[in-house]
Every structure is written in C-alpha cells, then in structure tokens.
C-alpha cells in the first residue's frame, strides 16, 4: 500500500522531462543503423499520447509519496551494471490496481448495484498506458554534467529501454482464468485475483531527483483533461515544456525560492513546433495549422494559470521573416507551487528519515 493522499505535488528529474520534447534538425542525434534497419526506433525520446502522460504521473505520484525511497526492497546499481551509467539507489513501489487507477485519475460511477466503481473503458485505457510504459522501448539520449578541477565535463548515455519494469502476479487461478488473462488482461473476471504490481523505474526516472528536478501538481494532467477534455497531446507537452523551461531559466537567474518578476520564455514558432513534435504539420510545411495548434496550447496554459499573457512577434532570421512567441509566466502560480511543494517535501523527509 502507498499512502499518497497527502501527495499533492510530484517531483520529476529534468533529464526525464527533456525526453518529452522534440528536436530541430540541427539538434538531431544519429541513430544506430542496426536499430533503424530493424524498425526499433522511430523517434528519439518519449513521444507520448495523453494517456501515457497520465500513467507516468501516477507512477511519479506513488514514488514521490515514498520520497523516492520506495515501499518494497529496491536495488543499488553501479555505473558498470546498467546502460544509463547510473550509480545509486533504484526504489521499487508495490501498489494495487485500485491505487494506480486512483492515482491515474480514473473516475468512479454509481452502478445499478448502488456501488461506485471504476469506469471499465477508462480503466482499460489507464492500464494499457501503464503497460505501454513498461513494454515499449524508447531511445533515451541524455547528458550529465560533472566537474573535474573546476572544468565541466559531460557524460553522455544512450540506450533503448522501457522507462519502467513491471512485475505483477495472480494467485489461485483455474486453467480457464489463466487463459482469460492472455486474451483480455485488463477486464477478465480473474482480475479479482490480481495481487498487485511492483514497478521498478529505469534510472532516468530517479537520476538527480534530489538536485536537478521540476515540481508540478500531481493532478497537472487531470486538470487539463477535466477543463479541456478534447485537448490534443500537444497541450500536455506544452504545459510540461513551460514547467521545465521555466525551472531551467530560474536556476540560471536565482537560487532563491521566490520567482523573478516578469519572467518570460522566448521561443521561435518553428522551434516550438519541433519541441511539441508537430511532425505531420512540419513535414507538410503547414504553418497555419502549426500556429493554430500553438494558439490553442497557449490559450489552455493561460486559462489554467501557467501563463499570464503572450505576444507573437515577427523578426528577421537569415534574411527571412520568422515569428517567435514571448510567453509571460504567472508568477503567483509558480510561487504557490514552490511554497506548498517545499512544505510537502519537508513533511515527507521527516516521515522517511
């Protein structure tokens, strides 16, 4: 069991957040010919659907609720033992299917039996998203900075891996029930005999979690879905990009808890299209659709309180007319998250130390 009722904010490593964003052609990374020929890699990083965002946030909420210590036996990795070149503690979390569905945000509805039960369709979507994270290999490419006699040195790792490892079990099955799980693993009657999950995150989910991370509300994606049920996956990526880019910029400007006044993010519209992985529009050079999609993302971000306002301005780039977005952050929202998340973190540190 994981007590996550008091976990209102989640921590996520910036290394992980960076994987969610696309790259411009000049920033692309060469893929091993063997991987490309075998069709194992189509994109670099985490090209998520909205359900995958929800599933990852649910896992991160359960991890954050244990202060990234886990609630079952974890494992210590050496740099030589894993392709992420990670050295340190990997927590594992044990949780029930109900706990995951609640953390994901699946709604309960009153049934004819006068009981509140999870929606079957929403539950299936949530569990499929969890299985996707545990079975889909992603090409993870990241760098880690360390210092040698005052000189920064980059360590780079590149690996093809799912981002979580899932263990689960059933007890007391008949032969028929065992077969049902192979056919319909999410909704078979034998799910009543499901004894829960144990999830082991891959190292990028915990790398520098205490020193190089962002904080976001635990319901950040549930809020998008509730207020804007038809929001595209671009909106989910855009909100994450705002949170991550803002955290990086603040780290460069100040180490204080308070956020600078009039903090803004400047980004070329074309660059933003790549960041949000608008590949189908980019390939057809449909800039009108790109601007309309970005407009919708900005509108959602303003209505949810992440941005206070925006400007789109034109400028000359290599003798060509280009456009860029100036996005003004809502300082009050970010300061509230910083203050309340620190209170939560202090509470968890007292509980787990």
From Swiss-Prot:
Q: What top-level branch of life does the organism fall under?
A: Bacteria
**Protein keywords:** Plasmid
Which named protein is this?
Answer: Virulence plasmid protein pGP2-D
Q: Which organism is it from?
A: Chlamydia muridarum (strain MoPn / Nigg)
